[in-house]
Amino acid sequence: LSYKDPQGFAQQMMTHETAHAMLHKKWQLKETASYQEQLRFLCFDEGFAHLLACGKEIASFDASMWIQEHYEPALAQLHQALTCEDESQQEEWLYRAQTGRYWDKFAAIAGKLYLISHLDELEKIYLEGPQKFMSPIFDTLERN
C-alpha cells in the first residue's frame, strides 16, 4: 500500500489503537452481553476510536458531506443487523460491523458520524458509556 503521508497515517493508527486501549480500561464488554449490546459497544468503541484518529482538526472540519453520504447507509445496515435473529447471521453482522473497507464498517461509521453530529456533547456521551450510546437509535430499534 502507498500513502501520501505515511507518517500521518501511522499517527492516526496509533491514536486509533490507543483510543481503544484507553476506552477498554474504563469500559469492557461483558462475556454475557447480548447481541444488541455487542453492536452498541462496537458503535461506541469504534466510533470514538475513529473520531479521535481524525485529530483536533475535527472540531473545525465540516463533516456534512460525510454525514450526508455515509450516515444513513451505516444506520440502515445497523438497523438490519439489530433486527437479525439468526445467530449465524448475527456473527457475520458483528464481523462486518468493524471490518472491511473504511466506509463499509457500519458500526464504526455510524458511531463516528453520530459523535461528529454531537461534538458539543462528547464528554457527556463518553461519561454515560456504551450502555446509553446512540440511545435515540438503539432504544427505538429495540422497542420495535
Kindly give the residue locations of the regions a language model identified.
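Post-HExxH zinc-binding segment in Zn-dependent metallohydrolases
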Residues: 26-83
